[in-house]
């Protein structure tokens, strides 16, 4: 199982590919003096697209999406 993780914070984009998700993974991002913690559970047997989370702080906004396939 592999995942494509796309994280966009403000105008900067960070991408991880081929993350093995045979076990739950924990991704920690430190950017612009903010800690953003993402927990990716095991992918289901179907496409999960998109799984999007959004949040806004006083100085930055972030968006994350991930696509999973077997």
UniProtKB/Swiss-Prot annotation:
GO cellular component: membrane
UniProt-annotated location(s): Membrane
Extracellular face of the membrane: 44-70
Superkingdom of this protein's organism: Eukaryota
Tissues expressing the protein: Highly expressed in B-cell lymphoma and lung cancer.
Misc. comment: The microRNAs that are encoded in a MIR17HG intron stimulate growth of cultured lung cancer cells.
Transmembrane segments: 21-43
Disorder named in the UniProt entry: Feingold syndrome 2: A syndrome characterized by microcephaly, short stature, and digital abnormalities including brachydactyly, brachymesophalangy of the second and fifth fingers, hypoplastic thumbs of variable severity, and cutaneous syndactyly of the toes.
Protein name: Putative microRNA 17 host gene protein
Keyword Transmembrane attached: yes
Stretches assigned to the Cytoplasmic side: 1-20
Keyword Isomerase recorded: no
Topology in membrane: Single-pass membrane protein
Species assigned in the record: Homo sapiens (Human)
Key words of the record: Membrane, Transmembrane, Transmembrane helix
């Amino acid at each position: 199982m592999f995942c494509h993780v796309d994280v966009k914070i403000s105008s900067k984009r960070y991408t991880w590919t081929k993350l093995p998700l045979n076990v739950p993974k924990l991704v920690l991002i430190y950017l612009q003096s903010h800690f953003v913690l993402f927990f990716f559970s095991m992918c289901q047997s179907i496409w999960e697209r998109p799984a999007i989370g959004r949040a806004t702080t006083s100085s930055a906004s972030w968006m994350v999406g991930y696509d999973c396939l077997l």
